[in-house]
Amino acid sequence: MSSIFINKGVEMMESEKSGGMDRYVTFERIDCFKNAHEVVSNALRVLEANPEMKNPFWEKFCSKIPDSFYSYTPQEDLLYLVCANVFYLEELFDEAEDEEGQAIMSRCEFECC
């Protein structure tokens, strides 16, 4: 076995011991629903502020936002929607030059997708 894999395992265990979050060890302290909710909230904000960015894709995306988003009831379907559309969401935030959306999308993708 390569020392690279062993070193990564040691790093992951040390991260866990120090209280750091590492999705490869556990999702225990990562609120993926909150992350996904923030991504969708920011996407809706960007689309509202930039009506010229709306197109049939975003209309369809908005129609697929589950009820759990609006009721803030943690369910996996919201995370699935975000993770299945990472590329498009990143592009939306990039085109809008929305740093907050970019940061939240990056965090959600890294921690949860």
Curated annotation (Swiss-Prot):
Key word Cell membrane present: no
Annotated organism of origin: Wolinella succinogenes (strain ATCC 29543 / DSM 1740 / CCUG 13145 / JCM 31913 / LMG 7466 / NCTC 11488 / FDC 602W)
Gene Ontology BP term (one): nitrogen fixation
This protein's encoding gene: cowN
Keywords: Nitrogen fixation
HAMAP family per UniProt: CowN (MF_02117)
Organism superkingdom: Bacteria
Similarity remark: Belongs to the CowN family.
Function: Is required to sustain N(2)-dependent growth in the presence of low levels of carbon monoxide (CO). Probably acts by protecting the N(2) fixation ability of the nitrogenase complex, which is inactivated in the presence of CO.
Protein name: N(2)-fixation sustaining protein CowN
